From Swiss-Prot:
The name this protein goes by in its record: Squalene synthase 12
Function: Component of the triterpene saponins (e.g. ginsenosides or panaxosides) and phytosterols biosynthetic pathways. Catalyzes the biosynthesis of squalene.
Annotated pathway: Terpene metabolism; lanosterol biosynthesis; lanosterol from farnesyl diphosphate: step 1/3
Subcellular compartments: Endoplasmic reticulum membrane
Enzyme Commission designation: 2.5.1.21
NCBIfam families hit by this protein: squal_synth
Molecular function as annotated in GO: squalene synthase [NAD(P)H] activity
PANTHER family: FARNESYL-DIPHOSPHATE FARNESYLTRANSFERASE, SQUALENE SYNTHASE
Organism: Panax ginseng
Similarity comment: Belongs to the phytoene/squalene synthase family.
Family matches, as Gene3D superfamilies: Farnesyl Diphosphate Synthase
Biological processes annotated in GO: farnesyl diphosphate metabolic process; isoprenoid biosynthetic process; response to jasmonic acid; response to molecule of fungal origin
Residues annotated as transmembrane: 281-301, 391-411
Induction: Induced methyl jasmonate (MeJA) in adventitious roots. Induced by A.niger mycelium-derived elicitor, thus improving ginsenosides production in adventitious roots culture.
Amino acid sequence: MGSLGAILKHPDDFYPLLKLKIAARHAEKQIPSEPHWAFCYSMLHKVSRSFGLVIQQLGPQLRDAVCIFYLVLRALDTVEDDTSISTEVKVPIVMAFHCHIYDNDWHFSCGTKEYKVLMDEFHHVSNAFLDLGSSYKEAIEDITMRMGAGMAKFICKEVETIDDYDEYCHYVAGLVGLGLSKLFHASGAEDLATDSLSNSMGLFLQKTNIIRDYLEDINEIPKSRMFWPRQIWSKYVDKLEDLKYEENSAKAVQCLNDMVTDALVHAEDCLKYMSDLRGPAIFRFCAIPQIMAIGTLALCFNNTQVFRGVVKMRRGLTAKVIDQTKTMSDVYGAFFDFSCLLKSKVDNNDPNATKTLSRLEAIQKTCKESGTLSKRKSYIIESESGHNSALIAIIFIILAILYAYLSSNLLPNKQ
C-alpha cells in the first residue's frame, strides 16, 4: 500500500488503496491450479500487478487469451530490450517468435529478475497458448509475427524522424491495440474497431512510456536504448544523452514538452475508441491505462525530474483511477482534469506552447461536448489540495489499533 506520508498528505487515497490491496489478494487467490496456467497468471501478476488486476475482470475465455497475448509480447519485448544480446542473435529470434510460441520446448535465457524466469520457463506460456481457441491463436500469431518483423527493422536502424517514431511505436504498441481489438471481436463482445483507432490506443501508451523512461533507457548498460526521435531532440541538443545534464535543463524541458505535445495528438482517437466499447469489463480494461497515460504526461510535462529520476503517478492516485473508472463519463472527466493540469503548466515562452494549447483545447472540447462532465466527481484535481482531518484521525486510530494488536500478540509476554 502507499507510504504513510503519502496517505497523510492525500488522505482520500486511503480507502481506494485498501480496496486495491484487497482486490490484489483476491486476484492472487484466483490463480488456476493447472501448472501451465498457474505459471502464466502468477507471472502476469509479477510483471504487471495493475494490468493483472484488470485482466482478471474479463470473461474467462477472453481473460485467458489476453493473459497469453500479454505474456507472449512481454517475452518478445524482453528479447528486444536486452542490450547484451548481439544483433546477429537477436534479429532471427524476434523474426521467428511467432513460430516459437507453437514450440512447447523452446526457451531462450535473457532478461533479468521475473523476466528471466518468464524466458527460462516459456514452455508454460506455449502450452497455455495451444489451449486457446483457434481465432485467438490466429490473432496472437499474426500480431507477434508483425511485431517481430518491425522490431527487427528497428534493431538495425535508429529512430531518426517523427515518421520513424510513429512507425516504431506502431510495431511495438499500435499492433497491441490491433491485436486486442481482434481478441475482443473474436470473443463476440465487441465490434471490430478500426485499425486507426486501435493503433492510437497503443501509441498513446507507448509514447507516454518512452517519455517517462528517458533516464532509464539512456543509462541502460551495456548500451543505451534511444527512442526519442532525432527530428525532435536535435532542435535542442547535439546528442540525446545531453538532455540529462543539469546545464542543459532549460533545453531539456523544451524538448520534453515537444515530446508530450506529440503524444497528445492521439488522445482524441483514444476517446473515440473507448466511447464505442459496449462491455463494462472490456471498457475498464482499456480505459484505466489510458487515464494513467494522460495522468503521467501531466506529471512529466515541464518537469526536469524526468531527466533526474523516476516520475510516476503516486500509488494512491493509481488506486483511485482503478476504483473510480466505470463509465465513459469518468474517462471524459479524467481526461478533462488532466488536460486542465497540463494547460496550467504550459509556459507561454515555450517554443511549442501554441501547439500544446491547441491540442489540449481539442481534448477539452471533446470532453465538454460529451455532455457528461457535470455528472462526475472531479477527484483528480480537487483531491490534490486540502486535508480531510476526520479521515486522518480515523487512519491514526486504525494504526493505533493495529499496533496494539501486534504488540499484544507478537511481543513476548513479560514475566
